[in-house]
From Swiss-Prot:
The keyword tRNA-binding applies. One of its GO terms (biological process) is translation. The gene is rplP. It comes from Psychromonas ingrahamii (strain DSM 17664 / CCUG 51855 / 37). Belongs to the universal ribosomal protein uL16 family. This is Large ribosomal subunit protein uL16. The lineage of its organism: Bacteria, Pseudomonadati, Pseudomonadota, Gammaproteobacteria, Alteromonadales. One of its GO terms (cellular component) is cytosolic large ribosomal subunit. SUPFAM superfamilies: Ribosomal protein L16p/L10e. Keywords: Ribonucleoprotein, Ribosomal protein, RNA-binding, rRNA-binding, tRNA-binding.
Amino acid sequence: MMQPKRMKFRKMFKGRNRGLSKGTEVSFGEFGLKAVGRGRITARQIEAARRAMTRHVKRQGKIWIRVFPDKPITGKPLEVRQGKGKGNVEYYVAQTQPGKVLYEMEGVPEKLAREAFALAAAKLPLATTFVTRKVM
């Protein structure tokens, strides 16, 4: 699973997932999986989608992961009263806005890429769409 190697601060404020996204173009591969909705993707979901794609294309071509889970999410154990400080870090998430390209792929036929991205999209908690690279 992906997580930061080291952070200046271990815990983070909740914050708000607003604004527009950077990384809206397919820049590395031929095909991409773009987020249509806004949300949080956990490191486990990113890895599960990557595995589904890799297995479907039988390790052909190349896959790029364009999101990184750098936001720590904390939680308190069950049946613990409130107060006594912020909970421990449970997992890491990547916050995504509409238009963000999540994965890219090249070296496989378009039909196979569409099928692989459909499998990956089933593992993700937000709506996605298939995009191709714009050639000038």
